[in-house]
Amino acid sequence: MAGPATQSPMKLMALQLLLWHSALWTVQEATPLGPASSLPQSFLLKCLEQVRKIQGDGAALQEKLVSECATYKLCHPEELVLLGHSLGIPWAPLSSCPSQALQLAGCLSQLHSGLFLYQGLLQALEGISPELGPTLDTLQLDVADFATTIWQQMEELGMAPALQPTQGAMPAFASAFQRRAGGVLVASHLQSFLEVSYRVLRHLAQP
């Protein structure tokens, strides 16, 4: 029977492919895009920079978590996706952004709501492991900063609601395994969300 070192690359690839397939609907929503908006260029460039930073942080967390799952056989790909459903780990929609008629107010609102959601999901992963703690903390801060940037722009445009949203119920992880498996799914969902966000923002930043 092959050992962990032999099975690790195959399991890692299978897990990444399965997670990518489960995220495909989000990426498919990214076409086509409507005409560019009149959002300030400085705001859009700042957002693009923040997205790239979060993508780097998220990729680092995702790589460590997926590698652990593959190496120590903690997460079978199909079981991991089923666990995500049972734990109620949600997706953040961006349906108002990549469409023929871009809804600017709705898009900014969904960007902010999505970031706020992932901020809560990342907070739910606290205590996942001492090794991953610093990476998780950095990721939380960067997501919170990006959400603040979006909210401030909404306020400047008069699009912000009277009150900021409150965090809903987050998944409850009953074991260290569930927390690590949930971490893989949260990181994957966040990366898919950021891919679409980046594409939309880059389009809007075009002259």
From Swiss-Prot:
Residues 1-30 form the signal peptide. Keywords: Cytokine, Disulfide bond, Glycoprotein, Growth factor, Pharmaceutical, Secreted, Signal. Glycans are attached at T166. One of its GO terms (biological process) is regulation of actin filament organization. It comes from the Eukaryota. GO terms for cellular component: endocytic vesicle lumen; extracellular region; extracellular space; lysosomal lumen. One of its GO terms (molecular function) is growth factor activity. O-glycan consists of Gal-GalNAc disaccharide which can be modified with up to two sialic acid residues (done in recombinantly expressed G-CSF from CHO cells). Disulfide bonds join C69-C75, C97-C107. It is found in: Secreted. Granulocyte/macrophage colony-stimulating factors are cytokines that act in hematopoiesis by controlling the production, differentiation, and function of 2 related white cell populations of the blood, the granulocytes and the monocytes-macrophages. This CSF induces granulocytes. Belongs to the IL-6 superfamily. Monomer. This is Granulocyte colony-stimulating factor. It comes from Homo sapiens (Human).
